[in-house]
């Protein structure tokens, strides 16, 4: 299941993201963050972290460098 989610995100990056204007306010981008969070923390926690990150990615948030935290 983890592999499927990561492949879906990679598909988004290859096929959909180039069509849309750049809009992510963070480094790494939200899709890169989601892939890394899912790979590092698993499906449930990684997806929850990615959703929270995407909810913060809006014009009123300053953005900036926000890496996936290390696993404890």
Swiss-Prot record:
Membrane topology: Peripheral membrane protein
Keywords: Cell inner membrane, Cell membrane, Membrane
A Pfam family reported for this protein in Swiss-Prot or TrEMBL: YidD
InterPro entries tied to this protein: Membr_insert_effic_factor_YidD
Cellular location(s): Cell inner membrane
A single GO cellular-component term on record: plasma membrane
Annotated function: Could be involved in insertion of integral membrane proteins into the membrane.
HAMAP family with a match to the protein in the record: UPF0161_YidD (MF_00386)
Family named by the database record: Belongs to the UPF0161 family.
Protein name listed in UniProt: Putative membrane protein insertion efficiency factor
Lineage: Bacteria, Bacillati, Cyanobacteriota, Cyanophyceae, Oscillatoriophycideae
């Amino acid at each position: 299941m983890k592999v499927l989610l990561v492949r879906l995100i990679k598909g988004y990056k290859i096929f959909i993201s180039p069509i849309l204007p750049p809009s992510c306010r963070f480094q790494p981008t939200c899709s890169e963050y989601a892939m890394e969070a899912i790979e590092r923390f698993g499906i449930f926690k990684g997806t929850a972290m990615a959703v929270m990150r995407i909810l913060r990615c809006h014009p009123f948030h300053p953005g900036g460098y926000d890496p996936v935290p290390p696993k404890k």
